[in-house]
A protein has these predicted regions:
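Signature for phosphate-centric chemistry
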Residues: 27-170, 174-424, 428-527
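C-terminal motif of bacterial Sec signal peptides marking the signal peptidase cleavage site
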Residues: 16-18
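A conserved catalytic-loop motif detector
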Residues: 13
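Bacterial signal peptide processing site
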Residues: 20-22
Length: 527
C-alpha cells in the first residue's frame, strides 16, 4: 500500500448506478438492503447483491439455452508475510519499552493469531494444494460454492439438459493457484448437488479436488490470454506461435504493463495521491489508542525502522513445527506506514473469520480511518486497473478486449447452432474483472476522469468493494424461443444489471433486463 492519499470524503455508500429506463435509476452492484461499509475495499467478502427469488420473469416463450460466467477468486489470506511481521517487530519493541496502552497490549496476541492463521491457511483442507500464505480462506471457498448453488437454482432446466450432453460444461482459469482452487470448489459444489454433472465437465482435471489433478493449457483448462491478460510475458506466453487475436491481446498487455510501469501521467497522479496532508492526522487516530506518544514520535529514526525480517513459528494440528520467514523488503519508517500496514490486516480479516477464531481487528481501525485508506486504495486501483484518466486512451480496458469478444463468441455459437457447451465457467482475478467491467462500459460505473481532476469519493462513484469484491462475478444467461430469437441477460455480482445506456434500444421491452442479442452485439460493435 503506497502512502498516502489526496482525498475528499463523502458518505459511506455512494453506489454505482445504471439506468433502469430513460428516467429511472437502477443500481447494478449495490445490494437491495445495504449495510454500512466496512471499507475493506477490494478485499470485501462476497455477498450476492439480489435475492434469487426477485429476478425479473423470463419473457413468455423463451427457454434458457446457455450461461457463462467470469469470476474472481474468493476471499483469501495475506499474499505473503509482510505487514504482519513488520508490525509484530514494531510491537515487540514497544512492548520492551513499556510503550503500549492496554489496547496495544492486546495487539500482540492478535498479530500472532494473524500470522498463525496465514501460515496454516488451508492446512488439511481438501482442494488446497499447499497450505500457507495466499490461499483461499474458508469464507472464500464457501463464496464460490454459494455462487454455484444459486446458479443451479436459477437455471434448473438448463443444467438438467447439461446432464444429458457430453462435455456440456467447460471450465477455464488463469492457471494461478487461487483461481484454479476457486474453479475446483465451484465445480465440486455442482457435482455435490447434481452428481450426474461430473462426467459432463471438461477438462476432467476440474472434477477432482485432489492436488494430483493438475490443469494445463494443453487440455484447455488454462487460458492466460483471456484470464491473465494483465501480465502476459515472453517466457510464458510466446513459446508457441500466436493467433492474430492472441497477438493483439499480447500487444495490449505489453502496452498496459508499460503504462503501469513507465507512464509519466500515471506516476504523477499516484504521487499526487500519496502527498496527503491528512495522512499524519489519520495515522495518529489509529496509533494513539495503541502506543504511547513518545514511541510513535520515534518511528523512522535510527533503530525505529521495522521491517518484515526474522521469522515466526507455529505448531500444526499434527504437531509439526512450521516456520515462515519474512523477506525484509517491507518497512515501517513512519507513523503513516504503521497505520497503513494495520489497515491491510484489518481489511484482510473480513474474509478470514473462521481462521482468526474470533480475533477482531475492527477495534484497531476507526471507521473514518478505514474509509481514508480505502479511498486511497480505490484511487490507486481506479487509475492503475480501472477507468483511469481520459488521456490514457483506454489502455487499462483494451487488455480485456479478447475476453469481451469471447463472451459474445460463445453466444454467436448458440445463434449459429454450433455451441458444444451449455455453460462456460471462467475463474480469474481482480485484474481481469475490473478491466472487463470497464470494457463493457456498465452505465455510470466506469467513467474515466480527465487528468485535471483527481479521483476521490466526491468526484467518482467507482468503488472497489462494489466493482471487485472477493469472488466478484459477471454472468450472462442466454434464452431462445421457437422463432430463433436470442436474448441475453446480465448479472453483476448476481444482481440483474443493464448494459451501457447507449444499448437501451436493444432491450427486449421497456424496463426489461433482457436484451435482443443481435442488437446488443451491434451496439458493442463486435465483429
Amino acid at each position: 500500500m503506497k502512502i498516502l492519499l489526496k482525498s475528499s470524503m463523502l458518505c459511506a455508500s455512494i453506489l454505482l448506478a445504471a439506468c433502469n429506463n430513460d428516467d429511472q435509476q437502477h443500481n447494478p452492484t449495490s445490494p437491495e438492503t445495504s449495510t454500512p461499509s466496512k471499507y475493506y475495499q477490494t478485499k470485501t467478502p462476497y455477498q450476492p447483491q439480489q435475492d434469487l427469488n426477485k429476478y425479473q420473469a423470463t419473457p413468455p416463450g423463451f427457454q434458457p439455452v446457455f450461461t457463462e460466467l467470469v469470476a474472481r477468486h474468493g476471499s483469501r489470506g495475506l499474499s505473503s508475510m509482510k505487514y504482519d511481521l513488520a508490525l509484530y517487530n514494531l510491537w515487540k519493541q514497544a512492548k520492551a519499552e513499556q510503550a503500549l496502552t492496554p489496547l496495544g497490549e492486546k495487539l500482540g496476541a492478535d498479530l500472532e493469531s494473524m500470522m498463525k492463521a496465514n501460515i496454516l491457511l488451508g492446512y488439511g483442507v481438501e482442494g488446497i494444494r499447499q497450505f500457507g500464505y495466499g490461499n483461499e480462506s474458508m469464507t472464500g471457498i464457501q463464496e464460490h460454492r454459494g455462487i454455484a448453488d444459486r446458479l443451479l437454482k436459477r437455471l434448473p432446466d438448463l443444467f438438467k439438459a447439461a446432464s444429458t450432453q457430453p462435455a456440456s460444461i467447460l471450465v477455464q482459469s488463469s492457471g494461478v493457484d487461487r483461481a484454479v482452487d476457486s474453479a475446483k470448489f465451484f465445480t465440486a459444489e455442482l457435482i455435490q448437488q447434481q452428481p450426474q454433472l461430473k462426467t459432463h465437465i471438461t477438462p476432467i482435471s476440474y472434477t477432482s479436488l485432489a492436488s494430483s489433478s493438475v490443469l494445463s493449457i494443453e487440455d484447455g483448462g488454462v487460458d492466460r490470454f483471456k484470464l491473465y491478460f494483465h501480465s502476459l510475458n515472453k517466457d510464458q506466453d510466446l513459446a508457441q506461435p500466436l493467433s492474430a487475436q492472441q497477438q493483439a491481446i499480447y500487444d495490449a498487455s505489453q502496452a498496459y504493463q508499460h503504462f503501469e510501469e513507465e507512464d509519466t501521467d500515471l506516476a504523477n497522479k499516484l504521487d499526487e495521491l500519496a502527498k496527503n496532508s491528512r495522512a499524519e492526522q489519520v495515522a495518529k487516530s489509529v496509533l494513539n489508542p495503541l502506543f504511547k506518544a513518545e514511541f510513535i514520535q520515534k518511528l523512522g529514526t535510527t533503530g525505529y525502522v521495522f521491517s518484515n525480517t526474522g521469522s515466526y513459528s507455529v505448531i500444526s494440528p499434527k504437531g509439526e513445527t512450521i516456520t515462515e520467514k519474512g523477506k525484509g523488503k517491507n518497512s515501517i519508517a513512519s507513523a503513516v506506514d504503521a497505520a497503513a500496514y494495520l489497515y491491510e490486516l484489518y481489511s484482510i480479516s473480513g474474509g478470514m473469520k473462521t481462521e482468526l477464531k474470533g480475533v477482531d481487528f475492527d477495534r484497531y481501525m476507526p471507521v473514518d480511518a478505514a474509509k481514508f485508506y480505502a479511498e486511497y486504495n480505490d484511487a490507486n486501483d481506479f487509475y492503475s486497473k480501472g477507468p483511469s484518466f481520459t488521456e490514457s486512451n483506454s489502455v487499462t480496458s483494451a487488455i480485456a478486449q479478447g475476453l469481451k469478444q469471447d463472451l459474445f463468441k460463445q453466444v454467436d455459437a448458440i445463434v449459429d447452432q454450433q455451441q458444444a457447451h451449455r455453460a462456460v465457467l471462467r475463474f480469474a482475478h481482480a485484474e481481469i474483472i475490473i478491466p472487463l467491467a470497464t470494457s463493457l462500459e456498465l452505465h455510470n460505473m466506469m467513467q474515466p476522469l480527465p487528468l485535471r481532476q483527481t479521483y476521490s469519493y466526491n468526484s467518482s462513484t467507482w468503488r472497489g468493494e462494489l466493482v471487485s469484491p472477493m469472488a466478484a462475478n459477471l454472468q450472462w444467461d442466454i434464452y431462445q424461443n421457437k422463432q430463433g430469437i436470442t436474448l441475453v441477460k446480465m448479472f453483476y455480482n448476481e444482481k440483474e444489471t443493464l448494459f451501457k445506456s447507449s444499448c437501451n434500444y436493444a432491450r427486449y421491452s421497456n424496463n426489461s433486463f433482457y436484451y435482443d442479442y443481435l442488437k446488443l452485439k451491434q451496439c458493442y460493435q463486435i465483429q
